Curated annotation (Swiss-Prot):
Stretches the record annotates as Disordered: 91-146, 257-305
Compartment list: Nucleus
Listed Polar residues bias regions: 94-104
UniProt GO BP: anterior/posterior pattern specification; diencephalon morphogenesis; inner ear morphogenesis; metencephalon development; midbrain development; positive regulation of transcription by RNA polymerase II; regulation of transcription by RNA polymerase II
Protein name: Homeobox protein OTX1
GO MF annotation, one: DNA-binding transcription activator activity, RNA polymerase II-specific
Principal subcellular localisation of the protein: nucleus
Protein's job: Probably plays a role in the development of the brain and the sense organs. Can bind to the BCD target sequence (BTS): 5'-TCTAATCCC-3'.
Organism whose genome encodes this protein: Homo sapiens (Human)
InterPro entries attached to this UniProt entry: HD, Homeobox_CS, Homeodomain-like_sf, Otx1_TF, Otx_TF, Otx_TF_C
Tissue: Expressed in brain. Detected in the anterior part of the neural fetal retina (at protein level).
């Protein structure tokens, strides 16, 4: 502000010029008549108009264009006003129902919000695995932040959160991180291997949410993966990738998660691979080859950079033949969801996702 004030001469003059010039232009554009086009006058309905509108509303809450036009002619208002009136009237109805029914819808909303929070948390690294994770929330729980991956890892790689992740792609990823989440996730992922296998568990969860899976895979890195896998967010892939890169290395060793590796190196490129990988993991858990899972984890973890990459790809591929394609898909994030589904135990995947 100060600097502007100090240069009134220049600034002001410039502005002054601009102002008048603009004014001059606007008139030709009809400026005077409509000084502010953005705001329309508030439409006031007469009682008779309201009666007509309410009568139609009683008949149908969603009148089609023909009905709206007919009413618009009757009451002398543009059809767009009629449309807006119905939109507002429906909103009013919903509000009344809500307050009447004692905020039934709110709880649901709240749930989702935790999920969202999860996302946040994952970013923040808070390790908040929302209980939400159980259902869609499962991913939310996964949401326990991936940031906390280390903790999660310590926790035993609460990979299960992955499942949650699947649900909430991003958050899920986060959740994935949280061991707590894991439980929920893992439960859903029937594969919830023992916690030690949490990673696998994750996997299984992952499987379910491949993306989540990815997350799981990322298990430690669920977050990133989850995001990627979940891709639900859309930015997940990159996310994972960055996540992977970043967190992976740190958590990786400790986590031992195969995910890390995926996350890490493969993340971006391998993101898909990672995803695939996840899938496979999921498989393992499914098969309950926790040992297997673990192996994978270690494997990744050790070679997580190069090996992981190869692994990812390979594994992914293995697990889901279409892996290659999937991989690229995964890459896209898309792949996560669809591919994962396809490749993965679809059933579990789907289940998770749904």
């Amino acid at each position: 502000m100060m600097s502007y004030l100090k240069q009134p001469p220049y600034g002001m003059n410039g502005l002054g010029l601009a102002g008048p010039a603009m004014d001059l232009l606007h008139p030709s554009v009809g400026y005077p008549a409509t000084p502010r086009k953005q705001r329309r006058e508030r439409t006031t309905f007469t009682r008779s108009q309201l009666d007509v509108l309410e009568a139609l509303f009683a008949k149908t809450r969603y009148p089609d264009i023909f009905m709206r036009e007919e009413v618009a002619l009757k009451i002398n208002l543009p059809e767009s006003r009629v449309q807006v009136w119905f939109k507002n009237r429906r909103a009013k109805c919903r509000q009344q129902q809500q307050s009447g029914s004692g905020t039934k819808s709110r709880p649901a909303k709240k749930k989702s919000s935790p999920v969202r929070e999860s996302s946040g948390s994952e970013s923040s690294g808070q390790f908040t695995p929302p209980a939400v994770s159980s259902s869609a929330s499962s991913s939310s729980s996964a949401s326990s932040s991936s940031a906390n991956p280390a903790a999660a890892a310590a926790a035993g790689l609460g990979g299960n959160p992955v499942a949650a992740a699947s649900s909430l792609s991003t958050p899920a990823a986060s959740s994935i991180w949280s061991p707590a989440s894991i439980s929920p996730g893992s439960a859903p992922a029937s594969v919830s291997v023992p916690e030690p296998l949490a990673a696998p568990s994750n996997t299984s969860c992952m499987q379910r949410s491949v993306a989540a899976g990815a997350a799981t895979a990322a298990a430690s890195y669920p977050m990133s993966y989850g995001q990627g896998g979940s891709y639900g967010q859309g930015y997940p892939t990159p996310s994972s990738s960055y996540f992977g890169g970043v967190d992976c290395s740190s958590y990786l060793a400790p986590m031992h998660s195969h995910h890390h590796p995926h996350q890490l190196s493969p993340m971006a490129p391998s993101s898909m691979a990672g995803h695939h990988h996840h899938h496979p993991h999921a498989h393992h858990p499914l098969s309950q080859s926790s040992g297997h899972h673990h192996h994978h984890h270690h494997h990744h973890h050790q070679g997580y950079g190069g090996s992981g990459l190869a692994f990812n790809s390979a594994d992914c591929l293995d697990y889901k033949e279409p892996g290659a394609a999937a991989a690229s898909s995964a890459w896209k994030l898309n792949f996560n969801s669809p591919d994962c589904l396809d490749y993965k135990d679809q059933a579990s995947w789907r289940f998770q996702v749904l």
